[in-house]
């Protein structure tokens, strides 16, 4: 399975390329004036510490000096790993010159929307095939 999704907001839009590699998943997220790789998050599913019947995930994050995408890759990799019960690697590179605090808040909202788009595509594939492939 491989696909690309993008948010369609007024501004601060994000795109993601999602690819299944065996049982694992690779997600690249980019947006802004200078898309790049600023951080990488690697997450693995595990039973929740609060409720072993629920799935959770633990992530390790690597971030280049001066980059702030660590928050994005941690959130997305953990959420997808728990949802898919799989190992997930997420890269992100987002850059807008002189972004305001309001702009950062809008980017965070777009990350949530991007996650919903990713999960909807995976759900559609599961429904169509009876399983994720």
PLM region spans:
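Conserved mixed alpha/beta catalytic, RNA-binding, or beta-rich assembly cores of soluble enzyme
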Residues: 7-83, 87-96, 103-111, 117-125, ...
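Short amphipathic
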Residues: 1-7
